[in-house]
Design a protein with these regions (language model features):
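Active-site hotspot residues in diverse enzymes, especially metal/ion-binding acidic/histidine motifs
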Residues: 1-305
Length: 305
């Protein structure tokens, strides 16, 4: 079965799933909420080289397991992949880090191609992709850095986002091949400009177009304000202007570079869902973004907090 056929089947299944599960199609998609609504039990635990697994409902309640050793965006993609197995009627499936030793996607069986295509379309429907671009102040992605920033609003892995942009007809195959050579770690370090970041943390670049939007973040993430003339007002509980102190951070600066003071803030575990961060410009205009911290995902999903 070709990838084109897999995407064709997945697009139909995704459209049905979005409607049946009342999932957003023009914003960040809550895949874990969708799994709960469809009756799939979800658990998280460290799984080594395993991405996750799906257990069909032939012996009882269907369930899936996600690897909490992965960063949040990779867990979200894995969860959407397992939801694809469920919605497309596949049997129990174990998903490893690499489906084959060759080129990505080469030699994958039909059900894995369908589930992978489902995951991309479920998390990145066209309206959601356009909304993410708009919040970046973009009409189209013009560089790997644009894709990295776009993926922060979608909650998706960098490489997966690049591949899906071809399906959305926002880039061509030649551009895809070039952009896939870029490491997301290098891209986030470039955007951070020396600001400290842990290995699984991300940098969220907040442009004027992000005003009044909702941003999903993880503890350790950095919010870099790039609204001209703006500085953060009083930071809510769960945000700090003090850089994280981690032994393996990407930068070992003990303080925030002077140009970024008042424009950089880090997320902590104390952030309450629905917190709003505001900034005021030199002309007294107010910029705000609503923040939602993703929970820890160890154990059964009903205990995540």
């Amino acid at each position: 079965m070709s990838w084109n056929s897999a995407h064709g089947a997945a697009m139909i299944a995704v459209a049905q799933a979005h409607e049946a599960l009342a999932a957003a199609v023009d914003d960040y998609v809550d895949v874990f909420g969708a799994l709960r609504r469809t009756g799939v039990e979800v658990m998280g635990q460290k799984l080594g080289g395993l991405l996750g697994l799906y257990i069909d409902g032939s012996q009882g309640i269907p369930g899936c397991l996600v690897n909490t050793g992965l960063e949040e965006v990779s867990m979200r993609h894995t969860a959407a992949h397992e939801l694809g197995h469920h919605r497309m009627g596949h049997g129990t499936s174990i998903d490893h880090q690499e489906q084959s030793s060759g080129r990505w996607g080469e030699g994958w069986p039909q059900h894995e191609r369908e589930a992978e295509a489902f995951a991309s379309w479920f998390l990145m429907p066209r309206p959601a992709a356009r909304a993410a671009l708009a919040r970046c102040g973009l009409a189209r992605p013009e560089s790997p850095l644009d894709v990295y920033r776009m993926a922060r609003w979608l909650g998706t892995p960098y490489a997966t986002t690049v591949r899906h942009l071809v399906r959305l007809k926002m880039i061509d195959r030649a551009t895809e091949a070039v952009w896939l050579k870029h490491s997301p770690g290098v891209l986030k370090a470039e955007l951070a400009g020396g600001l400290p970041l842990g290995p699984q943390a991300h940098i969220h670049v907040l442009k004027p177009a992000a005003h009044a939007a909702t941003l999903h973040v993880t503890a350790g993430d950095c919010l870099l304000l790039t609204v001209p003339g703006a500085r953060y007002d009083h930071l809510p509980a769960g945000l700090t202007s003090t850089p994280p102190d981690t032994a393996d951070q990407l930068s070992f600066l003990s303080s925030v570079p002077a140009p970024e003071q008042g424009r950089a803030a880090w997320v902590t575990q104390e952030l309450v869902a629905g917190s709003t961060v505001t900034a005021t410009t030199d002309s007294a205009e107010v910029f705000r973004v609503i923040l939602r911290r993703t929970p820890g995902r160890e154990g059964a999903d009903r205990f995540w907090a």
